[in-house]
Amino acid sequence: MIEDALKAEGITYTEDPNNKSAMVLLVNCKGQGTMPQMLAQKQLDAVIAWEPMPEIIKNKGIGKVIAHSEDLPSATGGTWANHPCCCLAASENALKNKREAVITFAKLLKDATDEINKNRDLAVKASVRWLGTNENVEKDSIEHIKFDYRLEPVIPKVIKFVEAMKLQGLINGKLKDASSEEVKDIIFDLQTYNEIINN
């Protein structure tokens, strides 16, 4: 997503520290755990991270949030508003041989999503317990997260991700030359989704 946003704005970037002609050097931190320390020690100028890391960095006084991912421009047009983030994926093998377990687990996630949307305070407290962050971080963080299992608004955004990745040369296999409709059919199992939602 960050590479797509940089491309949309005509900002050159590289992952090669020896390439001094690029405007931005991208560094893979191999996860988010080291980001606060690297920012504090001026090893990084900025990070792109998912919640709650931006709020942790802000809460510790190390940095401030300058944009959320939904505000970033896209080389495919528009912004990344309402983009999907975390999802449940199952292999064809699991759907065939462990279908009941996959569907039961997905229904549990659906019910948990409904509960989070009804009771954000419970979600905050659970995150504090699970992640070991403080409550203020989680309260601030949850304001920037949408919890939704409906596919209708997500499908076009997933297709947008695929198109952005195609522009970056990151897609191969079945998706490489697939049309939007084919991408939808390859990625989403709507029959299983409807079984989860309607039962």
Curated annotation (Swiss-Prot):
It comes from the Archaea. PANTHER family: ALIPHATIC SULFONATES-BINDING PROTEIN-RELATED (PTHR30024). This is Uncharacterized protein MJ1181. It comes from Methanocaldococcus jannaschii (strain ATCC 43067 / DSM 2661 / JAL-1 / JCM 10045 / NBRC 100440) (Methanococcus jannaschii). The lineage of its organism: Archaea, Methanobacteriati, Methanobacteriota, Methanomada group, Methanococci.
